[in-house]
Regions:
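Extended, surface-exposed interaction regions
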Residues: 1-83, 120-124
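Helix-rich interaction surfaces within compact, conserved domain-sized segments
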Residues: 77-109
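Protruding loop/beta-arch "assembly-hinge" segments enriched in small, turn-prone residues
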Residues: 108-124
Length: 124
């Protein structure tokens, strides 16, 4: 997938990519209780959409650059690309949303390491 990851996708490919990302993220939250699952479901869809859109914006930025040249009368000026602005805004929102999702992940209970102490006490 790394080869075509940076190519533009058509609408159907985008929908499939979003669905795949939703499935991937949903798998991480499979053990959630039903109340949290309802909250997480919508957030997962939004995060999946943002991730795919960020990839699309990245394709545009890699091909067109972060700056564009605009004619201003007799001279030209360099201004920030609209894709650059959109990417910067969306990456902040994506980071916030993914952080919220990570907070909702079930906490893994650290397994107790058997150090043999219980066996020692039981044997006395």
């Amino acid at each position: 997938m790394a080869e075509n990851k940076w190519k533009e996708r058509n609408d159907l490919q985008q929908k499939r990519a979003i669905s795949a990302e939703v499935a991937r993220l949903s798998g991480l939250f499979a053990g959630l209780d039903s109340k949290k699952a309802e909250v997480v479901e919508g957030l997962i869809r939004e995060v999946a959409f943002m991730r795919i859109q960020l990839e699309e914006l990245k394709v545009k930025l890699l091909s067109e650059g972060f700056m564009i040249t605009m004619p201003q009368g007799k001279y030209e000026i360099q201004v920030e690309s609209p894709y650059s602005r959109a990417y910067a805004t969306m990456i902040q929102r994506y980071t916030t949303a993914i952080g919220k999702l990570m907070e909702l992940l079930p906490k893994e209970v650290a397994g107790m390491v058997d150090d043999g102490f219980d066996d020692f006490v039981d044997s006395r």
